[in-house]
């Protein structure tokens, strides 16, 4: 069927610089993987040890800002004049769907192992204390604190969308109240947008780098096809081709249906793990972990370990705070767009409660299952990681469940669909951000979307070639540094403009 939707052209000043920068970095990495790994280790050490404290203070300050929004003068302000576009149930379900990416399935299953084997606060590895704090740290990293920071930025973007009626497709559009129209639309705004795009490209590449091995390991388990880097590259290529076909043939409705299937299948798979793994233990472990979280929360918030130098807060807390920072603008734009018509307080409470429930369910069920398999000596996670890699260890936590073949098919389909929708979202977001103003009824050009999906795929392959989690962690942390400042500027711009246009009556 023909469509009358218009296509908008690329914006050279934000299209070519990120393309060139990322292309050069990928080329330099592939030229010498060993040298690249040395640089990666140096960058990771410098940023986390020298500037890790800044990410921790950023999260705390944004949390204070959340309380100001909820209980301050803007709490009852509506984000747009229209009634809410979606029912509260649908709204929360859409937020849950945004949490069920393949990268989340990756971390949810294996993260607790790292916390138990290399615990914080001087605890002995694999001790009772380490196990007690393992899930508590997952609930900390994926709980109310980061979602509170996202809700603040979501309010900011919803304000610009629905109150100020701005067409926001890049962060520079929101900076006019802070730096003036001349700078926001000039060189300064262009630099901000390029920082945002380069960081977003690497973030999406890392998500693909986490997701792909899960699918290829599933293929090895189900079909006996050996997992190799070549197979990873082939699978990524197939996803890119599938995405191109979907876009070219106007199958975006099919992609949306796939996204819904992913959400329902996520509920089904989590329910299955919850029932067969040990529902009573999971609920008891969760309850105990919430208490542990509340007991250790002040130290977790500010833990940098300059005396013990264990490296735990740098490797995990700073890494995850950078992860949240780097995805903040993209996620907040999406969450803002589905929150039209709601009050500031409603958006803040809804996001923190709904999204915290989503991530806590994921991490509690999957993390508890991994811990049980380790405690019962069903799986030797360290040996699996040493001999076969992290992805194989994750697959084995699913394969160890009853009806293993059916379970693995469900997990395979879930990971495959999650990655297809990831690539589609990546290409669409990057294409929208690198084209001229895209208004209602317009779409970014097909070749631009395909081009960005290819580049994201290449980054995923490069990170897989480097091997291990450190390159992925470093890519996130390096990308999070510039966006740390961009997010702050967007926040300050909102506060400044709201004082003028949301005057107290």
From Swiss-Prot:
Chief localization: membrane
Coiled-coil blocks: none
Spans through the membrane: 10-30, 50-70, 92-112, 143-163, 195-215, 231-251, 263-283, 316-336, 347-367, 403-423, 446-466, 475-495
Catalytic reactions on record: 4-(trimethylamino)butanoate(in) + (R)-carnitine(out) = 4-(trimethylamino)butanoate(out) + (R)-carnitine(in)
Gene Ontology biological-process annotations: 4-(trimethylammonio)butanoate transport; carnitine metabolic process
UniProt entry tagged with the keyword Transport: yes
GO MF, one annotated term: (R)-carnitine:4-(trimethylammonio)butanoate antiporter activity
Pathway it works in: Amine and polyamine metabolism; carnitine metabolism
Cell compartments where the protein resides: Cell inner membrane
Keyword annotations of the record: Antiport, Cell inner membrane, Cell membrane, Membrane, Transmembrane, Transmembrane helix, Transport
Entries under InterPro entries matching the protein: BCCT_CS, BCCT_transptr, BCCT_transptr_CaiT
Keyword Transmembrane helix: yes
Annotated membrane topology: Multi-pass membrane protein
Cellular component GO terms, alphabetical: plasma membrane
Self-association state and partner proteins as the record states: Homotrimer.
Record's function text: Catalyzes the exchange of L-carnitine for gamma-butyrobetaine.
HAMAP family in UniProt: CaiT (MF_01049)
Family, as annotated: Belongs to the BCCT transporter (TC 2.A.15) family. CaiT subfamily.
Protein's recorded name: L-carnitine/gamma-butyrobetaine antiporter
Species of the source: Salmonella arizonae (strain ATCC BAA-731 / CDC346-86 / RSK2980)
């Amino acid at each position: 069927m023909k469509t009358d939707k218009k296509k908008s052209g690329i914006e050279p000043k934000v299209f070519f610089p990120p393309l060139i920068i990322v292309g050069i970095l990928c080329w330099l990495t592939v030229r010498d993987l060993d040298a690249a790994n040395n640089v990666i280790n140096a960058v990771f050490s410098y940023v986390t040890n020298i500037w890790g404290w800044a990410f921790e203070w950023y999260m705390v300050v944004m949390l204070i800002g959340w309380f100001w929004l909820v209980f301050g003068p803007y709490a009852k302000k509506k984000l747009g004049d229209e009634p809410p576009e979606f029912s509260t149930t649908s709204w929360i379900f859409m937020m849950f769907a945004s949490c069920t990416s393949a990268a989340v399935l990756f971390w949810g299953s294996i993260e607790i192992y790292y916390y138990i084997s290399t615990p914080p606060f001087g605890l002995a590895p694999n001790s009772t204390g380490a196990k007690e704090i393992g899930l508590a740290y997952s609930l900390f990293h994926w709980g109310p604190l980061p979602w509170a920071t996202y809700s603040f930025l979501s309010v900011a973007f919803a304000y610009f969308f629905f109150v100020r009626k701005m067409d926001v497709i890049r962060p520079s559009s929101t900076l006019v109240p802070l730096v003036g129209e001349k700078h926001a639309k000039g060189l300064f705004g262009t630099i901000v947008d390029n920082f945002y795009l380069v960081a977003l490209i690497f973030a999406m590449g890392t998500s693909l780098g986490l997701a792909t091995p899960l699918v290829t390991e599933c293929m090895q388990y189900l079909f006996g096809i050996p997992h190799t880097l070549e197979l990873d590259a082939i699978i990524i290529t197939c996803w890119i081709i599938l995405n191109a076909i979907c876009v070219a043939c106007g199958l975006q409705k099919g992609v949306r249906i796939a996204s819904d299937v992913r959400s329902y299948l996520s509920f089904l798979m989590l329910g299955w793990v919850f029932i067969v793994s040990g529902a009573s233990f999971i609920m008891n472990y969760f309850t105990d972990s919430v208490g542990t979280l509340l007991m250790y929360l002040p130290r977790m918030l500010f833990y940098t370990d300059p005396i013990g130098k264990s490296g735990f807060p740098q490797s995990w807390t700073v890494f995850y705070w950078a992860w949240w920072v780097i995805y903040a603008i993209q996620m907040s734009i999406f969450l803002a767009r589905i929150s039209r018509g709601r009050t500031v307080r409603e958006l803040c409470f809804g996001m923190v409660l709904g999204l915290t429930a989503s991530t806590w369910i994921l991490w509690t069920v999957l993390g508890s299952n991994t811990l049980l398999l380790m405690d019962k000596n069903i799986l030797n996670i360290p040996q699996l990681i040493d001999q076969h890699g992290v992805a194989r260890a994750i697959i084995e936590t699913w394969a160890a469940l009853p009806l293993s073949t059916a379970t693995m098919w469900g997990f395979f389909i879930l990971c495959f669909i999650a990655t297809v929708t990831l690539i589609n979202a990546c290409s669409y977001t990057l294409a929208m951000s690198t084209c001229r103003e895209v208004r209602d009824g317009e779409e970014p050009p097909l070749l631009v979307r395909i081009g960005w999906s290819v580049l994201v795929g290449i980054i995923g392959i490069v990170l897989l070639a480097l091997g291990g989690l450190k390159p992925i962690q470093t890519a996130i942390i390096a990308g999070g540094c510039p966006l740390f400042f961009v997010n702050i500027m967007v926040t300050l711009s909102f506060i400044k403009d709201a004082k003028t246009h949301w005057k107290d009556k």
